[in-house]
């Protein structure tokens, strides 16, 4: 049915996601889920709309890399660092909850998200200051992410907050054993960077993130563990935030989230998945993010190998990440984004169906 919809835009996604939240709230007999989603959707609308004015006054505008698709040059001077207006309301909400509950899990989550948020903020700020598309060097950014991730993982593992068993179903669990720490690192840093790589077309990362947060929140609810319900509430609040931001980020974008937003969103997804033992289903829900990231690794890997062997590097894609390949193939930006959204919705449905039937 989704595939037959000719125009699947922001309004279509908003209606579908909201309907799904209403249905979920009804099925689980708890309307706080649709309530928190709706509240943060409107908070995000307000903060983003006013944030655009603030960013323009501060002259915090996007620099576009010249080696990218030519049609992206018109995006230059679009306000960026919009992630500030997505993440700060969420961090305040998380801080208030943690003050009331005094949860170590929530405290670690708060510190980790804040760390990735600062990393993204510094990267965006330096990019604007240097008038380039990149701020921190790749190695510098990865180093900062790694330090934050390692601190989170070791503290969580030390306090038995990370389960070494990846739960596929109630009867099927995979024991990570000695690979618990490296896999946890891969999940946290990998998803964070994957969301960052996906954020290359108007509305792509924000829309997909809103969908994934809904899926993750619902999967956590299906565990039927009272102590985990708060994480579903956090996921639904982020789903609302992403869709509120999407109103101004969908084509033609009036604001970009920047690394401030994308790195933080990935960190929220990865850390919540680790703390709730939802890594398996997150890997399905985040299929778009993972494919985008893999396309870059394949492109770079093949180029380096062929250059070493044949002294002439070959490329698999016209450009990576994958969304740029389709752009250079002549597919319109809006159509690429709409199709990726549709695929992401199907992945969330697949993940939930597997959760029910396995």
Swiss-Prot record:
Catalytic activity: UDP-N-acetyl-alpha-D-muramoyl-L-alanyl-gamma-D-glutamyl-meso-2,6-diaminopimeloyl-D-alanyl-D-alanine + di-trans,octa-cis-undecaprenyl phosphate = di-trans,octa-cis-undecaprenyl diphospho-N-acetyl-alpha-D-muramoyl-L-alanyl-D-glutamyl-meso-2,6-diaminopimeloyl-D-alanyl-D-alanine + UMP
Keyword Iron included in the entry's annotation: no
InterPro entries: Glycosyl_transferase_4, PNAcMuramoyl-5peptid_Trfase, PNAcMuramoyl-5peptid_Trfase_CS
Main location per the UniProt record: membrane
Chain ranges passing through the membrane: 13-35, 81-101, 106-126, 142-162, 171-191, 201-221, 228-248, 268-290, 336-356
EC nos: 2.7.8.13
Cofactor names: Mg(2+)
Enzyme's top EC category: transferase
Membrane topology reported for the UniProt record: Multi-pass membrane protein
Molecular function GO terms recorded: metal ion binding; phospho-N-acetylmuramoyl-pentapeptide-transferase activity; UDP-N-acetylmuramoyl-L-alanyl-D-glutamyl-meso-2,6-diaminopimelyl-D-alanyl-D-alanine:undecaprenyl-phosphate transferase activity
Keywords for this protein: Cell cycle, Cell division, Cell inner membrane, Cell membrane, Cell shape, Cell wall biogenesis/degradation, Magnesium, Membrane, Metal-binding, Peptidoglycan synthesis, Transferase, Transmembrane, Transmembrane helix
Disulfide bonds: none
Keyword Transcription in record: no
Subcellular location: Cell inner membrane
GO biological process: cell division; cell wall organization; peptidoglycan biosynthetic process; regulation of cell shape
Pathway: Cell wall biogenesis; peptidoglycan biosynthesis
Highest taxon above the source species: Bacteria
GO CC, one annotated term: plasma membrane
Task performed by this protein: Catalyzes the initial step of the lipid cycle reactions in the biosynthesis of the cell wall peptidoglycan: transfers peptidoglycan precursor phospho-MurNAc-pentapeptide from UDP-MurNAc-pentapeptide onto the lipid carrier undecaprenyl phosphate, yielding undecaprenyl-pyrophosphoryl-MurNAc-pentapeptide, known as lipid I.
Family classification: Belongs to the glycosyltransferase 4 family. MraY subfamily.
Name of the protein described by the UniProt record: Phospho-N-acetylmuramoyl-pentapeptide-transferase
């Amino acid at each position: 049915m989704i595939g037959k919809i000719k125009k699947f835009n922001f309004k279509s996604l908003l209606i579908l996601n909201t309907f799904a939240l209403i249905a979920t709230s009804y099925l689980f007999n708890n309307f706080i889920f649709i309530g928190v989603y709706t509240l943060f959707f409107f908070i995000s609308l307000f903060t983003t709309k006013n944030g655009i004015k603030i960013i323009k006054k501060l002259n915090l505008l996007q620099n576009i890399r010249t080696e990218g698709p030519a049609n992206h040059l018109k995006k230059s001077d679009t306000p960026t660092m919009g992630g500030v207006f997505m993440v700060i309301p969420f961090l305040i909400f998380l801080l208030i909850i943690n003050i009331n509950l005094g949860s170590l899990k929530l405290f670690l989550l708060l510190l980790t998200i804040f760390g990735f948020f600062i990393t993204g903020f510094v990267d965006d700020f330096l990019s604007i200051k240097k008038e380039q598309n990149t701020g921190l060097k790749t190695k510098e950014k990865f180093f900062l992410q790694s330090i934050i991730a390692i601190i989170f993982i070791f503290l969580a593992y030390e306090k038995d907050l990370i389960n070494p068993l990846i739960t596929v179903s109630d009867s099927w669990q995979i024991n990570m054993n000695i690979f618990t720490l490296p896999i946890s690192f891969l999940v946290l840093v990998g998803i964070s960077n994957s969301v960052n790589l996906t954020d290359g077309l108007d509305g792509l990362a924000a829309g997909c993130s809103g969908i994934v947060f809904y899926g993750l929140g619902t999967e956590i609810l299906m565990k039927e563990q009272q102590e985990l319900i708060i994480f579903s509430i956090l996921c639904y609040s982020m789903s609302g935030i992403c869709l509120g931001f999407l109103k101004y980020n969908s084509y033609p974008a009036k604001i970009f989230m920047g690394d401030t937003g994308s790195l933080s969103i990935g960190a929220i997804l990865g850390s919540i998945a680790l703390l709730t033992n939802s890594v398996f289903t997150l890997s399905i829900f985040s299929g778009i993010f993972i494919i985008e990231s893999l396309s870059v690794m394949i492109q770079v890997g093949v180029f380096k190998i062929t250059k070493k062997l044949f002294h002439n590097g070959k490329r698999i894609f016209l450009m990576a990440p994958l969304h740029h390949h389709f752009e250079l193939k002549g597919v319109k930006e809006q159509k690429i984004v709409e199709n990726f959204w549709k695929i992401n919705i199907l992945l969330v449905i697949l993940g939930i169906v597997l959760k029910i039937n396995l």
